Amino acid sequence: MRPLSSAALLSAIGAVAAQVGPWGQCGGQSYTGGTSCVSGWACVFLNDWYSQCQPGAEYTPPLCGRNDNPNIFQATTTSTSVSATAPPSSTSSSTASVSSSTSSTPIPTSSGSFVKAEGLKFNIDGETKYFAGTNAYWLPFLTNNADVDSVFDHLQQTGLKILRTWGFNDVNSVPNPGTVYFQLHDPSTSTTTINTGADGLQRLDYVVSAAEKHGIKLLIPLVNNWDDYGGMNAYIKAYGGSKTEWYTNSKIQSVYQAYIKAVVSRYRDSPAIMAWELSNEARCQGCSTDVIYNWATKTSAYIKSLDPNHMVATGEEGMGLTVDSDGSYPYSTYEGSDFEKNLAIPHIDFGVFHLYTADWGITDNSWGNRWVTSHAKLCEAAGKPCLFEEYGLKDDHCSAAVVWQKTSLTTAGMAADLFWQYGQTLSTGQSPNDRYTIYYGTSDWQCAVIDHVSRI
């Protein structure tokens, strides 16, 4: 999730001849397009990286804006950040080739069973019911094993069964010694090196191993739509093209699939993996929904060919649906995604969606209940579970979010929810605080987490 441009920057850029259409981007750091919206629409600042054409005073349907990435927080000023051991030197070969920095074998596994979809619920270690969990994107980037163990201790003690964390960390140059990264995409040689060293995938190894020991199940996205921790743009810098072309660029897709193979094969036999996610919040602004749909169809089939043991999900925000639509931005297909269409892909095992009312410009938080039930209806019709995999409010963690939890818990088609995001005190200080963070042991933890788990 990325931050997007200020109103001051918009005025400094100046007017551009072409007007931006409804829900289009009209400002943001590094943005060079139009800043004037079509009649009836106004350019609204959402964050430092993104301003959007939203309905003006003449427009009557409910407003919805979207902070493109409210849940990504970086602990440092670099795009790949967080410390570890010195990176190994990278090796590379011909264009679009992928090499591995060290040899590696799959990590050993412990007892436990693979998570399955069973009707409209998940079966986890023999139990078929509703589950609660959380997100902690930063966990594989920690270098102190005791910190990782402590996180899993707290999750286990609280009864949170599912954890979503990043399975990607892409860079375009070898970072400073002591920085974790998983892939190096070198623009000077158009080659990619997968880092399986002590400051690479071995950090993810430890997370998977610790999850096994604690009986926690992991959801792992394999690339980021946003620039945080490299994302799709890290591929583009090395192999060319544009963000909208990422999904169809043959060189990029071959590199992406090579990374998928390396990671999925590494943990294919681990019962700690709940599911692989194609990406975090895939978007293709202005594209036909066929672009993401075709990519998701091909990629999910590829993952299943490598690993029939684990489920696959899209990792999408859940945009683009007609059920209960109020005509607002999240219900539209403007970002190139069609939730119902993607849900029907044969190798997609369950539906996922996210919810951030404040960042979407929604002032009535009860709107979130409609968002939950809209997706649940589609999941129920498809015969697949629905996972409410990201949600939150800045600073206020115990009002609307608790109502959303109750709606999810009592709605047919819903199988689990994961709040954004988990926090605790580590050996280096507090884990990242993006104002959505709910810290272990606080009063917010009691009302938003412990009380929620007790209701299940």
From Swiss-Prot:
Subcellular location: Secreted
One Gene Ontology term of the molecular function aspect: cellulose binding
Active site residues according to the UniProt entry: E281, E390
Binding locations of substrate: W166, N280, Y356, W420
Cellular-component GO terms for this entry: extracellular region
Domain notes: Has a modular structure: a carbohydrate-binding module (CBM) at the N-terminus, a linker rich in serines, and a C-terminal endo-1,4-mannanase catalytic module. The genes for catalytic modules and CBMs seem to have evolved separately and have been linked by gene fusion.
Protein name: Probable mannan endo-1,4-beta-mannosidase F
Protein's organism: Neosartorya fischeri (strain ATCC 1020 / DSM 3700 / CBS 544.65 / FGSC A1164 / JCM 1740 / NRRL 181 / WB 181) (Aspergillus fischerianus)
Lineage per the UniProt record: Eukaryota, Fungi, Dikarya, Ascomycota, Pezizomycotina
